[in-house]
Amino acid sequence: MISGILASPGIAFGTALLLKEDEIVINRKIINIKNITKEIERFFEGRRKSIQQLTEIKTKTKEKFGEKKESIFEGHIMLLEDEELEQEVISLIKEKNMSAAAATELIIEGQAKALEKLKDEYLKNRAIDVRDIGNRLLKNILNLNIIDLNNINNEVILIAKDLTPSETAQINLKYILGFITDLGSRTSHTSIMARSLEIPAIVGTGNITKIVKNNDFIILDSINNQILINPSHKLINQTEVIKKKYLTKKNQLINLKNLQAITTDGHAIKIGSNIGNVEDIKSAKKNGAECIGLYRTEFLFMGRNCLPDENEQFQAYKTIAELMKNKSVIIRTMDIGGDKDLPYMNLPKEENPFLGWRAIRISMDRKEILHTQLNAILRASAFGKIYILFPMIISVEEIRILKSEVRKLQIQLKNNNIPFDKNIKIGIMIETPASAIIAEYLIKEVDFFSIGTNDLTQYTLAVDRGNDLISHLYNPMNPSVLKLIQQVINVSHTHGKWTGMCGELAGDERATILLLGMGLDEFSMSSISIPKIKEIIRKTSFSSAKKLAQKALTLPTNREILNLVENFVNH
């Protein structure tokens, strides 16, 4: 039996798909003249397989995204069919006695470097495509295992070292029964994705990829924190009983979906859902979300080879606004960087990406990206109750610049007779100690705050939440983090405004009563967490929650705070 960190509740039975590709090892020795024909054949066979794979991906991309995105892979296929590429590779094999793989690598890398030297930004970015195509071609020449995430077409439990946002953006998620990873934490991307999909996940197992083999039968039990590999029929039957009880309780909680989160003494709280795409709205509604407290727009930018244009973004935002039927939808501008990469943007490799060029810093430097997104949001605001949310704000100067950009775009839309909400609300993420400390200045510039506890905790405690060596130090209920949260809430209330929370702490059952007592106005979380959080709030009095929070904020350690909360809940 293997265990890890409980990331998303549930129980799944299924076969394992191990996301572990073979490493490319190229023989750069001079080949025997007798093997030249064989190496040329290897090149042609590798190219044939690559074209076949890309043709399948192209077809599926057209079905999913339409002809515009299909053309990207058409270009990839044309590059593979290029006669010049073929002639140059064969020439190196024949004249330099190079292996097919070594010759291909040399030509592909030469093409990529030539593109990188060009001044044209679009052409420079094509170097990424060339290397991607070359990587596929090399693996097929060497007959290595290639896992095409787009081509998963049967139900599996996905096993991986870790999963990046760009990887999960490619997966046909309807076939994923659950996630198990070597690395990760409750706030890692894989965990957040699993909760969004309402599928079980256990992360941080340490070495699951070294133990599980493809097609092993797996029981993923993230209720009792156990992973069983090729279990007996007896264990399968026992776990099915546990799953049935869990689903019964889950269905009972779903009955709360149409009820408000009101305390026993009449204090109402707004409960929202965090989403990453239009498809997540179904889960949000099913679980009783009263609003969308966070729309992570960066997922619209992932799993593709180019930036989404204004109309594509507009259609996505408009659809969500209409589906929510005049309930508020908070749209956060693109939060790329840190652990979220876009290969086609050629983001620089940084020593400390979480402290580097990310989120609003990219948008402010690349105004064309910011303007395209803001225009799409403003246009969509005519179709619902949309708010704008800017991430990673650390100064008054930043928010003033951004508000100025919004005003300029509003004037342009007005001049072109394009409708938009003239009174659209603007808020900022409080996710750095800097923004929390100067909240009294920032609140004068905006309509609301949204606290991002994942990054706020990471930056306050100087703990990389993705580093397993120090993950035990990551605790959003640390006294320092709680004091910052309380300060932010108090400042907003003093100025007659409100504060929400969209970090994972908002959906943590241990923190619900504490945050309620601290005066948090809106809780936004993975949809799967909403029914349980509603139940807790509806069973609690606001007056007793306030007393609990006041006491908790006087305690000096994580353990004392947690003990206080647990004693309150159990009595």
UniProtKB/Swiss-Prot annotation:
Mg(2+) binds at residues 431, 455. It is found in: Cytoplasm. One of its GO terms (biological process) is phosphoenolpyruvate-dependent sugar phosphotransferase system. Pfam families: PEP-utilisers_N (PF05524), PEP-utilizers (PF00391), PEP-utilizers_C (PF02896). Its cofactor is Mg(2+). Phosphoenolpyruvate binds at residues 296, 332, 454-455, 465. Its EC number is 2.7.3.9. GO terms for cellular component: cytoplasm. General (non sugar-specific) component of the phosphoenolpyruvate-dependent sugar phosphotransferase system (sugar PTS). This major carbohydrate active-transport system catalyzes the phosphorylation of incoming sugar substrates concomitantly with their translocation across the cell membrane. Enzyme I transfers the phosphoryl group from phosphoenolpyruvate (PEP) to the phosphoryl carrier protein (HPr). This is Phosphoenolpyruvate-protein phosphotransferase.
